């Protein structure tokens, strides 16, 4: 809002783009790249960053302290054509308690700040009534870690259920999955469940600080399958630091263990399970413990993809990967 107000004032005063940039640079937390000169050593490393006169020597990171009082847009532009994310989005909290070593957002958006359930219900209803959307997503880095999730779900269901509005939880944790909560939330439309184990073996999950065990993953799937779910999405990464071929094959082994769990808990069915498996190409991110880790080559990534493909034979598994 401060930048928008500054822009409005600049337009009203007839300021040039450069004059506007000088004004907006006075706002705490705003960085204008063109106001800084970078010099380098002969080996290509950074020697110095020199600000122009009037620009702050160091831009201070600015953090929204209170999410309940922060601006949240409930009146959004509704496209005239169908779009991919054709739904309302509600940010329930910012930050993450987990600390996965590959996750840039988990480190950059600290500390954790949550909104109240009452305030979220109000924002959700305003957004849905203004947009006319038939689905709303409770967005965050780890939605199931929100402490007031059940109270929020109850409040939203009172509004959404009679209007046939779907309530979506995009980021679930295998170690705190609640079948009762999911049964209540998905009364309108039972969609698939999505989990991100990220690595195929416990050794590698521990190395990346993905604090979820194979037992928790299988137990969660058993709970979901016994509740009537027959579709699950699994996300992994290839090329994580210290990853070996054993870890890659471990992804396929975990998939087959999930298939066996479905056979034991899916109402005795032999068919009907859908496992959507996806692998991403790991890219080391700045400000994470893995920022200096080596990235595998595209050729090595595809070799690991083909290794995984060679170990996937079940017809119920749809495997997709990044080709570039």
Language-model features: where?
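Conserved structural-core and active-site-/substrate-pathway-adjacent residues in large, well-folded domains
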Residues: 1, 30, 70, 95-96, ...
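Short, glycine-/Ser/Thr-/acidic-enriched flexible segments
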Residues: 35-37, 77, 94-98, 107-110, ...
